[in-house]
Amino acid sequence: MRARRFIAIVLAALVPAALSACGGSPHGLASKDPQAIVAAATRAIEHVRSVRVSGTVDEGSRRDEIRFDLRLLRGRGATGRVAEHGLAFRMVTLGDTAYVQGTPAFWLQFGGTNVAAQLHGRWLRAPADHGDFASFASLTRAGTLIAHLLQGHGALSKGTTSTIDGRRVIAVHDASRQGTLYVATSGPPYPIRLVNASSDGARIDFGGFDAPVRLRAPARSVSVFSLRG
C-alpha cells in the first residue's frame, strides 16, 4: 500500500542519528566527544514537552519527494501532514484515537472508490493501534519517533562547528557518513538539522521546542468500523 510506504520511508530517513532536546549545558558541548554529545542529547529529550519535525525525503527525483511537517506534544498526541506528488494526508492523534484526512487520490490508494466517496471531506477515525492507523500514528507519537531516531547508528565521529539559521551547531556523523546531526552548541542542546545522504536522502529540521501545540478532535469524522467496502 502506497500510504504504508510513506511511513516506512519517513521513519527510515530518521534512523542514522540521535535526537537531542532541552536541558543541556550552555557551554562546552562542542568540546565533548560524539558519544558524550549523543548521551547528553538522549537524556535531554526526556524533558521536552513539544517539538516540530519537518522536512523532505527524496526518493531520487523531485517528483517523488516526500514532505512532512509534524508537531508532537508529549503525553497528549500530535498533528501533522505528509505529502508526495498528489497523495497527501493530515494526521491528528489524541490519546488512544487517531484521525486521518486524505486527498481524494490518497483515499483511492488507501481503500478504493467506495471508501474515497464515503470519506470525501471527512476524517477517518480509529483506535491508534488499529491496522494501518498504527503506522500513521507512529509518525505523531513522540516516543515512537524518538525511538527511531535513536536506534541503529554506527560508530560516531564529531564534525566541525558551523552556523544554521543563525545558531552555532556541532556536527555528529555516523560511521558511514550517511547521516549528520547538527546540535546547538549554546543554550539547550537542541537538534537543528538532520541530513541523510543515503539513497533515501533526507533533510529534517527540528524546532518549536516546548512551543504550544493545539490539539482538537476533528469534526465530521467517520469511524473506520462503519466504512463500507
Language-model segment annotations:
Residues 114-133, 209-229:
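A short, charged
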Residues 2-5, 9-74, 162, 211-213, ...:
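N-terminal leader/targeting segments and the immediate start of mature chains
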Residues 38-106, 180, 196:
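N-terminal mature ectodomain segment of secretory-pathway/periplasmic proteins
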Residues 68-78, 134-158, 164:
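Short, basic/low-complexity N-terminal boundary segments at the transition from targeting/disordered tails
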Residues 63, 82-85, 153-155, 165-167, ...:
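Short solvent-exposed loop/turn micro-motifs enriched in small/polar/acidic residues
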Residues 101-145:
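Acidic/charged, solvent-exposed loop-and-adjacent secondary-structure segments enriched in E/D, K/R, S/T
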Residues 89-93, 110-113, 202-205, 226-229:
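A short, polar/proline- and glycine-enriched secondary-structure boundary/capping micro-motif
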Residues 160-222:
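Gly/Pro-enriched, hydrophobic low-complexity segments
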